[in-house]
A protein has these predicted regions:
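RecB-family 4Fe-4S metal-dependent nuclease core
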Residues: 1-311
Length: 311
C-alpha cells in the first residue's frame, strides 16, 4: 500500500518559483560568493568579464556520478521500499554514470583526456564500496519510519537582498527529507572526499555557509519555520585506513551549528557580496582588486595578462 503523502510535501512540490529574466536580472550562486570572498578579481574575470574557466577533473566526474547514483537509490528507498532499493544494480548504474559524465566533460575539455582508465577504475571501485556501506546501514544514515523524501536537487530561487530585486540567488539542495511525526525538515549536503573531513575542514565557514544559507532560504521559500529545519553534511570517504582498535567507516556525518548567529553571519556575507558586485542596473562598474595569497598559484589566471597581480 502506497504511503499517504503529507500535505507539506505536496505544497513544497507544487511551489512555483520565480523565473530568472536574464535580460534584466542577474543570477548568483553560492559558488560565486565563495569565489568573490576568495578573490574579487577572479570572480570579476569569470562572471563579470566572461572569461569562464572550468577545469575538468576525475573528482568532478566522480562527484556528479556518485550524487546521481545515491539520489536514485534514495528515491527508490523512500518511494518504493528498502528491498526494491537494494535490488538496484547500483554498481552498474555508477559505472554508466561515470562513463556518461566523463564523456560530457571530455567534450567540454576540447576533446582532451584528463584521466586514464586505471584512475577511473579506482574511483569506480571506491564508489561501489561507499554505496555498499550506505545501503547496508541505510536506516542509520537516513531513517525510514515516519520519514518521507521531499526530493533530490530541490531548487532554491529568490532575491536574497530586498534592495536588489534584479539579483536572484539560485541553487539546488542535494537531498531533503521530512519527518512527519515531528514536522521536521532535514537538509542533506553530500560531499565526496578522499578520507573524510578533519577538525579544520569541519570548522571551515566557507563550507558551512552554503548549507546554512540553504536552511534560511528553504524556510523563506517553502514557509517552514527555521526551528523545524536541521542541516547536515553526509561526507563519504573514498579511502579508509584500517585500525586495530576500531572499525573505520566510509561515511561521516557532520552537523554544523546553524542557529541565529550563523544565520545572521551568512545573511550579512551574501548581502555584502551583492552590494559590492552589483547595482540596480546589473554589474557594478568598479575595478575589483585581486586578493594575493598562497592560492594564487592554483588560479587559472595566474601569470596571465588578465591579472596584474601575478603577471
Amino acid at each position: 500500500m502506497k504511503k499517504k503523502v503529507p500535505s507539506v510535501l505536496k505544497e513544497i512540490k507544487e511551489k512555483v518559483l520565480p523565473q530568472i529574466d536574464f535580460a534584466t536580472q542577474k543570477s548568483i550562486s553560492y559558488s560565486q560568493l565563495s569565489m568573490f570572498n576568495d578573490c574579487p578579481k577572479k570572480w570579476s574575470l569569470q562572471y563579470k568579464e566572461g572569461h569562464k574557466q572550468f577545469t575538468s577533473t576525475i573528482h568532478t566526474v566522480f562527484g556528479t556520478a556518485f550524487h546521481e547514483t545515491l539520489q536514485h537509490y534514495l528515491t527508490v528507498f523512500y518511494e518504493q521500499s528498502g528491498a526494491e532499493a537494494d535490488r538496484l544494480n547500483t554498481s552498474e548504474m555508477l559505472e554508466e554514470k561515470l562513463r556518461e559524465e566523463y564523456k560530457k566533460q571530455y567534450k567540454s575539455n576540447n576533446n582532451q583526456h584528463f584521466s586514464e582508465p586505471g584512475e577511473l577504475r579506482e574511483f569506480y571501485e571506491d564508489g561501489v564500496e561507499i554505496i555498499r556501506e550506505l545501503s547496508k546501514d541505510k536506516t542509520k544514515y537516513f531513517g525510514k519510519r515516519g520519514w518521507h523524501l521531499v526530493g533530490c536537487e530541490i531548487p532554491i530561487v529568490l532575491t536574497p537582498h530586498s534592495k536588489y530585486q534584479n539579483v536572484l540567488l539560485q541553487g539546488f539542495i542535494d537531498v531533503v527529507l521530512y519527518h512527519e511525526p515531528t514536522n521536521k525538515i532535514r537538509i542533506i549536503d553530500i560531499k565526496t572526499s578522499y578520507n573524510g573531513w578533519n577538525k579544520k575542514q569541519k570548522s571551515d565557514e566557507n563550507k558551512q555557509f552554503q548549507l546554512i544559507a540553504y536552511k534560511k532560504y528553504f524556510s523563506e521559500i517553502y514557509n517552514i519555520p527555521l526551528e523545524n529545519i536541521e542541516v547536515e553534511f553526509l561526507i563519504v570517504k573514498r579511502k579508509i585506513f584500517e585500525s586495530e582498535n576500531f572499525v573505520i567507516k566510509r561515511v561521516q556525518i557532520h552537523k554544523p551549528a546553524a542557529g541565529k548567529v550563523k544565520l545572521n553571519k551568512v545573511t550579512k556575507s551574501i548581502e555584502e557580496f551583492i552590494e559590492q558586485a552589483f547595482d540596480r542596473n546589473g554589474f557594478k562598474q568598479v575595478e575589483h582588486q585581486p586578493k594575493i595569497n598562497d592560492n594564487c598559484k592554483y588560479c587559472p589566471f595566474h601569470k596571465t595578462h588578465l591579472c596584474s597581480a601575478t603577471y
